[in-house]
């Protein structure tokens, strides 16, 4: 049996075009699901990060140090709260964009393509800015700052700092996935 295919006026086979569109849509949905999972995990890891340790505090040089239980939580630092919120927003947006991609079934208009492209671009900006903010605070906690007499806290709160570092790294990976989605969206524009 011969394989029959319909050709357009310019000679491109329609079946081949349908297969390419289907595989592109599959790649796009896979990348969006990956972005959804990454942002959800990043927000959760940082959101539940909490560690309590007993810290010796020396009030007067002649007296022994006073042991005080101190807790490190992401909600105590605005940059970490921003990172959690940015990941939650990106996660919600990704869920909506997955539904749009699935429902549209490849028949997306130019306006819808542009809206998704702009949304993806906004997520890149949001996630990159939150990565920078949380990363800066994380580095301050890990290395301290001699100029303003801020001491390292990751020596005491190691588990908390490691969770924050993992969350920041996952957020950075999610922003790269969104950047790849922007490129994919731009290639689809007529």
Curated annotation (Swiss-Prot):
Extracellular side: 50-83, 133-163
Native species: Arabidopsis lyrata subsp. lyrata (Lyre-leaved rock-cress)
Family: Belongs to the Casparian strip membrane proteins (CASP) family.
TM annotation in the entry: 29-49, 84-104, 112-132, 164-184
Tagged with keyword NAD: no
Keyword Aminoacyl-tRNA synthetase part of the UniProt annotation: no
Source organism superkingdom: Eukaryota
Pfam families: CASP_dom (PF04535)
Biological classification of the source: Eukaryota, Viridiplantae, Streptophyta, Embryophyta, Tracheophyta
Mode of membrane association: Multi-pass membrane protein
The protein's name in its UniProt record: CASP-like protein 1E1
Protein location: Cell membrane
Cytoplasmic compartment residues: 1-28, 105-111, 185-190
